[in-house]
Amino acid sequence: MDKIEIRGGKRLTGEVRISGAKNAALPLLASSILVDGAMTFTNVPDLVDVRSIKMLLRDLGAGCEEGEGTVLIDGSGIHKIEAAYELVRKMRASILVLGPLVARFGHARVSLPGGCAIGARPVDMHLKGLKALGATITIENGYIEAKADRLKGNEIYFDIPTVTGTENLMMAATLAKGTTVLRNCAREPEITALANALNLMGARVTGAGTAVIRINGVDGLSPATIHVIPDRIEAGTFMVAAAATGGDVLVTGCEPENMGGIINKLRQTGALVEIIDHGVKVSGGKSILSTDIKTLPYPGFPTDMQAQFMVLMAISQGNSVIHETIFENRFMHVNELQRMGADISISGGNYAMVRGVNALSGAEVMASDLRASASLVIAGLVARGVTTIHRVYHIDRGYEALEKKFSALGADIKRVK
């Protein structure tokens, strides 16, 4: 099994270009199910999760052609309505095919999903929403089955904002009869990107990016060419790494307007952050200042950046409190950072008390999930000595060529068997 080996202490300098966003690409590719024709997607990242959803679409009968960063999905050949366990078990985002399948074909059978083990992340709100649109739902033998002659518009309220729930029901409602109003929606940029794509396909979606989304159903959608937006979490990861190593890095191909929570918090740590056209320049400050962090739904500080910022706080001057409000069980990286000398304690399950230390030391560590693995890479970059990260398949789920990009910035990092 692959490992990543890092010799720390190198200052990162240079320019890095950000890939397309995994969390945008997955729902966009799933939306191709809604169309009886060929969709073209550009700026698609080459990630394990993206490969998984392409494999799932192929299994349903869709045609799939790939080029450099480009994917063509032809939904005209879809003849299956079942997303099998073997294809769904590794990735929670597979649930995103449920809404499009039942909307277009009136029937869907999708295995309960897998993915990162960072909390329950139940699909209850997806199912309640589909029921409100007129689908009958049964769960049996580990599969969700949804049936409807044709979905009918309705008003749906989310108990808490849910990104995939908002996306799933927004896609389903595009082909429903009448108007659907989704309330207390998640507001992430990836949701806005999906709504924009659906509208290019002929849907009538308004309000994406706000708490209330309105969808006027149409009889059918048409093929379109869709560009995947940049990955704000990948951009944030490189920005934190630049600050942590005292480096000077230009992060290009990103959208700073979607990264306010990350940029503001990074500035509070003393880093110099300059916003340019389609990019951000980050320079490490004279010292790393401690700051408290509370994860929140967008536009607040993203939970997907919590682990990376914890490394920065671990080597800061002072103490900080990190409050995780989005997912339970998302401090699994703490034990590994402690192995490297970090002074961190957990309180109540969702608070981390971080006391800054002068330096971390290299160690053998184990990645537990996607963002935890990114935090261990940053820790390895700043640590004295050699850090070896095991179970790096987590990294490949959400970061495209991570070690190559860091190497180009001057890091001593390599993948080994």
From Swiss-Prot:
UniProt enzyme class: transferase
Matches recorded under SUPFAM superfamilies: EPT/RTPC-like
Record-level Gene Ontology MF annotations: UDP-N-acetylglucosamine 1-carboxyvinyltransferase activity
Entry binding sites for UDP-N-acetyl-alpha-D-glucosamine: R92, D304, I326
HAMAP family cross-referenced by the UniProt entry: MurA
PANTHER family for the chain: UDP-N-ACETYLGLUCOSAMINE 1-CARBOXYVINYLTRANSFERASE
Family: Belongs to the EPSP synthase family. MurA subfamily.
The protein, known as: UDP-N-acetylglucosamine 1-carboxyvinyltransferase
Organism from which the protein derives: Desulforapulum autotrophicum (strain ATCC 43914 / DSM 3382 / VKM B-1955 / HRM2) (Desulfobacterium autotrophicum)
